[in-house]
Amino acid sequence: MIQFILTILSTISLICGRLIFNQRHRLLSSQNRIIHSNEVTIIIPARNEERRLPHLLQSLQGQQGIYEVIVMDDGSKDNTKEIAQTFGATVYEIEQNLDRQWFGKSHACYQGATNAQSELLMFVDADVTFGHPHAIEKILNTYRKQHNHGLLSVQPFHEPDKFYGSLSAIFNLMTVVGVNQFSSLARQSNNDIAFGPVTLMHRDDYFKTDGHKNAQHSIIEGFALGEKFESVQLPVTVYEGGNDVKFRMYEAGIQSLIQGWTKHFSVGADKTQPQIMLAIVMWLMGSITSTLTLLISVFTKPASRIVSFLFYVLYTSQFVRLHLRVGAFSMVLLILHPVLFIFFIFIFANSWRHTHFSKKVEWKGRSFKIN
């Protein structure tokens, strides 16, 4: 009886897995390229980024459409400034607010925008790299679809360089499917959620909406920007990074990974539409139900063992396929998905504790309040 119930739950899980990520949003292909003048300023907020910044700046070399590259140095104690200047970027020091109540990435981005000279503003995290010489051009071409207005954002493809980085697998997938634009289950409505690592806006729209000022009390600036743009009827679009835009998250160690995802999920989960969240939960539960079904089948008839093994293989193949859309994760961990599921639950519980009890999270030596 238990095995039968687990089999039914595993079946439901497989169906949910088919529905949570059955719509794709990719940047325009190279065959649709349009030659661009130098119309975009790249703005990079940076705090102690001497290790990651060279990869980003190197990937910007030879890109089409860039007017200038600005690095906003947010009190770095390392060689961030010197490295940026070596690559020809213009570096500005962050001017601290008198009340010191606004700081961090959103503060750096807004000050960067005030220094920019071009019509288009692209905000790029320091851990991002562009996968080929036409990546910026593809983003600009895609933005033309919305007539160079509104907010376009890209979630980079995750390429962890260390084994522990693959522990981020489920979180990366949830970041994409949780914005309600990649599932046929989503209610038809305007999108008010944006990804944070790469965002593109016209400067008129940016200052009309007050840009990153909207995020001065937000942990995830993409949410605040998306809500503001949508509230004034400006389009908000989201895209997968694929081979065009990539990043390596939390290279400083597993502790930074834990802190980073705790910060992200402390406010992110409530943005997902209920029906999509239910489907996500049911799909993730398939990691446990398919595994338990397989383990219990050891003590049952051969036919049951075959069916249980088949369900585990089907779920695992689906699990692997969905995750490889958003990152190059360890195949070992993807196949041993219960390990990833347990780690996900640990972070989610830790995030819930911060959200409802401590009301703050730590990131890069700073404490951020959760509203």
Predicted regions mapped to residue ranges:
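A conserved acidic beta->alpha catalytic loop
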Residues: 73-82, 96, 129
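N-terminal membrane-anchoring/stem segments of glycan-assembly enzymes
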Residues: 1-34, 344
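Short aromatic/hydrophobic "clamp" motif used to bind/position activated sugar donors
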Residues: 121
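Cell-envelope/extracellular polymer assembly enzymes that use nucleotide-activated donors
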Residues: 39-41, 68
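Long helical/loop segments within the catalytic core of UDP-sugar-dependent glycosyltransferases
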Residues: 95-104, 108, 141-208, 333-347
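Catalytic donor/gating beta->alpha subdomain of glycosyltransferases that bind UDP-sugars
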Residues: 143, 147, 151-162, 168-175, ...
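Short, acidic, metal-binding catalytic loop of nucleotide-sugar glycosyltransferases
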Residues: 58-67
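Membrane-embedded multi-pass helical conduit in multi-pass membrane proteins
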Residues: 279-358
